[in-house]
């Protein structure tokens, strides 16, 4: 609430449009694209006055929230009066209007109260610096950077001001903001990214007060640290306390803190997950499939088959499991008429996926986010999948004028037959597979992926992203007992 109110006030003070404010306070700083005004539309603008009044009446008189409470009050009250309460009403700071029968997104002018076509390129040049970190944005010399700096300095220092009143566990506070509001990093993680000492200097240079807890972090060096491979957090008494996490939590970041990969190249790494289980982690852009991560898959299977390993999990911490093949690589080869290289790429993929399918050890995929094209084919060639609930699975190749080349077509046809997803008759399964693949249908969730046949009825679904790899490892250990590779399927086509 403080962040929203502070951002509203800064938008008015810096004379920005709602699109400019959201463009700067969304993805460039690690927040969802709804940012501030889009978020108010989502939750309901009519709730804002009630929440603000409740905080004003209950917070101590010296709380910094009082300095910004009620920012944009006239605009908000006018909108509520006219029925502009957000997405549940006629619209809010944004609305959809029709122009010649086409839907047009419009944004509200905070000064005049009128609507105009929303500017989809409203960000300032400093927004592009977000990839380099928060400090890079704040160090820029444009109006957008000044706006972001004002909002972040006050909002982040307010989070430090509220320790220990809200909680003395900053890890819990950061977790609440990440899970509850889908922030990429919590406020204390963001201050560590900027640097605790840098935060103090920026506050002092702008004549702002430095909260005692932030000053303590600057003295200690940071809010978080690593001790013997475990995360530690700063407590209000100055001690660095090991963050206690459920034993069900496991991420690649945990493995990286505790050791080094068993093997790696520019596209993928092989990790020891513990309990004799290997993990293959992709780290290409969008985790796209290329020859080098296929090489790591083959290496992992070879290691598992020849060593004392129970099997291989394929997964990562990234937003997306695998967005498909590296089509840029394929297009580059095609433009050079390097047809043999293109053939080799396709053949390597087919060999790799068949190796996953018929390995002497079980292979489990831990899917999350986009699992498209070659990524969906990986899932279908594994013995089992442990899917995060927000897994988007589909064979989308026809969308760019190609067909699945690594076994997805025959695997999906087999699943349609096995799971009885089509009507009876000699052409039922073929027609169903042709329809799904030919129209590039994508499952919008793990449950839908199961109902469409991309996942099997026995595949698992995990709700908590931090538990996904742990659940996948458990599933692999279960199926490793007495494991035998599947028999090749015979396809009888009409």
Task: Tell me what each language-model feature is.
Residues 1-312, 316-319, 328-348, 352-361, ...:
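N-terminal glycine-rich phosphate-binding loop for ADP-containing cofactors
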Residues 377:
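Short alpha-helical segment that forms part of, or immediately flanks, the ligand-binding pocket
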């Amino acid at each position: 609430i403080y962040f929203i109110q502070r951002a509203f006030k800064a938008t008015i003070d810096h004379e920005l449009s709602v699109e400019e404010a959201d463009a700067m306070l969304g993805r460039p700083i690690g927040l969802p694209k709804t940012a501030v005004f889009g978020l108010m539309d989502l939750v309901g603008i009519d709730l804002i006055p009630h929440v603000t009044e409740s905080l004003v009446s209950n917070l101590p008189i010296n709380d910094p929230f009082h300095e910004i409470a009620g920012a944009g009050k006239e605009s908000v009250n006018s909108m509520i009066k006219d029925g502009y309460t957000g997405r549940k009403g006629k619209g809010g700071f944004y609305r959809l209007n029709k122009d010649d029968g086409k839907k047009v997104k419009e944004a509200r002018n905070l000064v005049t109260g009128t609507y105009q076509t929303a500017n989809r390129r409203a960000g300032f040049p400093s927004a592009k610096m977000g990839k380099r970190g928060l400090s890079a944005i704040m160090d820029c010399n444009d109006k957008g950077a000044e706006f972001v700096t004002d909002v972040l300095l006050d909002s982040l220092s307010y989070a430090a001001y509220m320790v220990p009143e809200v909680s003395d566990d900053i890890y819990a506070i950061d977790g609440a903001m990440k899970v509850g509001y889908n922030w990429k990093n919590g406020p204390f993680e963001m201050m560590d990214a900027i640097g605790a000492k840098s935060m103090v200097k920026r506050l002092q240079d702008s004549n702002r007060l430095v909260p005692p807890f932030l000053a303590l972090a600057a003295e200690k060096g940071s809010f978080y640290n690593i001790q013997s491979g475990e995360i530690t957090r700063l407590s209000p008494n100055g001690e660095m306390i090991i963050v206690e996490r459920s034993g069900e939590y496991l991420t690649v970041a945990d493995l990286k803190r505790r050791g080094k990969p068993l093997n790696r190249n520019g596209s993928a790494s092989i990790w020891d997950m513990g309990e004799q289980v290997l993990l293959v982690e992709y780290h290409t852009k969008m985790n796209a499939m290329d020859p080098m991560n296929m090489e790591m898959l083959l290496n992992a299977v070879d290691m598992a088959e020849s060593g004392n390993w129970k099997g291989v999990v394929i997964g990562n911490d990234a937003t997306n499991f695998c967005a498909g093949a590296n089509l840029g690589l394929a297009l580059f080869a095609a433009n050079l008429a390097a047809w043999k290289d293109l053939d080799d790429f396709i053949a390597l993929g087919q060999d790799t996926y068949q190796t996953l399918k018929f390995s002497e050890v079980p292979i489990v995929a831990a899917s999350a986010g986009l699992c498209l094209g070659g990524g969906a084919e990986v899932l279908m060639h594994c013995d089992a999948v442990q899917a995060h609930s927000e897994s988007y699975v589909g064979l989308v190749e026809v969308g760019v004028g190609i067909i699945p080349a690594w076994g997805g077509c025959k695997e999906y046809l087999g699943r349609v037959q096995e799971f009885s997803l089509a009507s009876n008759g000699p052409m039922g399964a073929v027609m169903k597979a042709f329809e799904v693949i030919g129209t590039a249908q994508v499952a919008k969730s793990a449950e839908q992926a199961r109902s469409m046949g991309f996942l099997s009825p026995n595949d698992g679904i995990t709700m908590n992203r931090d538990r996904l790899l742990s659940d996948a490892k458990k599933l692999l250990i279960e199926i490793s007992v007495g494991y035998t590779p599947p028999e090749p399927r015979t396809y009888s086509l009409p």
